[in-house]
């Protein structure tokens, strides 16, 4: 089976080539080993010039933008066409938004599992202000601060801010499972009411409310519905996120209108200032204990507030808004046989643990965990990663080495890396038991939704998601709650601006 990391060689005046093994500064030997073993550093692949071109200034970028948003096959088709045209999974192209939002849209695109992981190595790539790609939204949308997602690990504030997020996710850890079950139990009750009343239930609408309520109650101990924020939180967050990501989104408007308003101009932050201020006021009060911890770490209180808001609203709520419908979509399509296997596993593990959902019970549900990993593989919630080369180097695909120069922007389209047919059999299929057993465990290092391999743990010195394990946990809890209650379910699937639109059309209650 093909391997999945980039082997990097530094260009040097000396005829000798120094090969750098990929390794984090994490103290855990398992994480370091996982990152090194993804590819053998002894390979010497033939060098090839990175194919592709950027076209004329401005015109080439606009051409690529139109093809990306409006061409045949959508964005998957945009990248697949480049791979076919150049017979290469490393190519030069322009990434949206381009003119007149991004100063320089030119990237070297990494479109396979072998080249993609170079983006995780912060000794080789700089991550400064690259969270959203070739442009950065105005800091007016984040209280005037560059929040953690935009910081490179070399910056002095990165470590204390990431430490604060680890604290945020862990300081009420005993409340996570019971609060999730309470909030999402209510969600399924509301969905049953909708099914009885109108014959269908919009999972996304109910999930938005439940996700925000759970995050605030589980991690902060505050119910936003009982604050001045009321039930407006999800609506305010969605609008705020739109203003940050609009240059990268398609809303289904007429092409010329959409491309002019969303992709060529920035939406004015002033239009969402009142909404953002309402969110910030809530978190100043609700997150006082976490802000106090931030102050102890040397973080100014206001900076802590805006980082907590971003972490919970953009990263965590945004992640659950995309991932949970994705998970329900793929499982809904998997059918009753898969549902039966999951229900049997979930109910057996809970029964064997005194009827309680505990971490021990969850550990006895390997199929549930595999089903979550498979959703994260086939449709990762964040599809794109960026990094700027810190020095001249050679990035390797499966077959060739490509010289990249210092300062060039590297871009990875994750769905092509995690559906690489040289790594995954039946890559376009959702296979819920893909990660079971020893062979499945070996594949986990190629699951990289968290901006790092699933087999590695996030540290203060990398950009791997601080909430990596939390996200997998709550996704597993969703399946546990679902299959404790129901034997099977049916869905209708559509598209939405962020992720999938999922309507549940039936819920078959548990019979065993």
Curated annotation (Swiss-Prot):
Binding site for (13S)-hydroperoxy-(9Z,11E,15Z)-octadecatrienoate: 315
Location in the cell: Plastid, Chloroplast membrane
Record's function text: Involved in the biosynthesis of jasmonic acid, a growth regulator that is implicated also as a signaling molecule in plant defense. Converts 13-hydroperoxylinolenic acid to 12,13-epoxylinolenic acid.
FT transit peptide: 1-25
Gene induction: Transiently induced by red (R) light, far-red (FR) light and abrasion in dark-grown seedlings. Not induced by FR light in phytochrome A (phyA) mutant.
Distribution of this protein across tissues and organs: Expressed in coleoptiles, and at lower level in leaves of dark-grown seedlings.
Record's protein name: Allene oxide synthase 1, chloroplastic
Coiled-coil stretches noted in the UniProt entry, renumbered to this chain: none
Assigned protein family: Belongs to the cytochrome P450 family.
Residue numbers binding heme b: 127, 158, 162, 463, 465
Organism: Oryza sativa subsp. japonica
């Amino acid at each position: 089976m093909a391997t999945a990391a980039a082997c990097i060689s530094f260009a040097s005046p000396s005829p000798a080539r120094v090969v750098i093994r990929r390794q984090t500064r994490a103290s855990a030997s398992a994480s370091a080993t996982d990152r090194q073993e993804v590819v053998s550093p002894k390979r010497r692949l033939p060098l090839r010039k990175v194919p592709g071109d950027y076209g004329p200034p401005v015109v080439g970028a606009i051409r690529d933008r139109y093809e990306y948003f409006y061409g045949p096959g959508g964005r998957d088709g945009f990248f697949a066409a480049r791979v076919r045209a150049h017979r290469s999974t490393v190519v030069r192209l322009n990434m949206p938004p381009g003119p007149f939002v991004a100063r320089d849209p030119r990237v070297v695109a990494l479109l396979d599992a072998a080249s993609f992981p170079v983006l995780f190595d912060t000794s080789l790539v700089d991550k400064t202000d690259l969270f959203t790609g070739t442009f950065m939204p105005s800091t007016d949308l984040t209280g005037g601060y560059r929040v953690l997602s935009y910081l490179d690990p070399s910056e002095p504030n990165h470590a204390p801010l990431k430490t604060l997020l680890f604290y945020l996710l862990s300081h009420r850890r005993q409340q996570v499972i019971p609060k999730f079950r309470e909030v999402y139990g209510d969600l399924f009750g509301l969905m049953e009411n909708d099914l009885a009343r109108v014959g269908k239930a919009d999972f996304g609408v109910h999930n938005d409310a439940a996700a925000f309520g759970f995050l605030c109650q589980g991690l902060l101990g505050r119910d936003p519905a009982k604050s001045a924020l009321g039930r407006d939180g999800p609506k305010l967050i969605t609008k705020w996120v739109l203003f940050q990501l609009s240059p990268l989104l398609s809303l289904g408007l007429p092409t010329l209108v959409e491309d002019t308003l969303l992709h060529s101009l920035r939406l004015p932050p002033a239009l969402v200032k009142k909404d953002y201020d309402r969110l910030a006021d809530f978190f100043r009060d609700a997150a006082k204990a976490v802000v106090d911890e931030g102050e102890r770490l040397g973080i100014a209180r206001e900076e802590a507030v805006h980082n907590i808001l971003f972490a919970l609203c953009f990263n965590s709520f945004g992640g659950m808004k995309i991932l949970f419908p994705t998970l329900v979509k793929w499982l809904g399509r998997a059918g009753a046989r898969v549902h039966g296997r999951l229900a049997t596993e979930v109910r057996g593990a809970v029964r064997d643990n005194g009827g309680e959902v505990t971490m021990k019970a969850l550990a006895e549900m390997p199929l549930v965990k595999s089903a979550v990993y498979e959703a994260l593989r086939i449709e990762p919630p964040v599809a794109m990663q960026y990094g700027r080369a810190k020095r001249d180097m050679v990035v390797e695909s499966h077959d060739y080495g490509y010289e990249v120069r210092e300062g060039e922007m590297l871009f990875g389209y994750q769905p092509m890396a995690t559906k690489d047919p040289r790594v995954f059999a039946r890559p376009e299929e959702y296979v819920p038991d893909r990660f079971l057993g020893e062979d499945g465990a070996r594949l986990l290092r190629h699951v990289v939704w968290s901006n790092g391999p699933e087999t590695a743990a996030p540290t203060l010195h990398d950009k791997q998601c601080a909430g990596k394990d939390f996200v997998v946990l709550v996704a597993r809890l969703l399946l546990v709650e679902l299959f404790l209650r129901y034997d099977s379910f049916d869905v209708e699937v559509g598209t939405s601006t962020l992720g999938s639109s999922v309507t549940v059309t039936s819920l078959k209650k548990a019979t065993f």
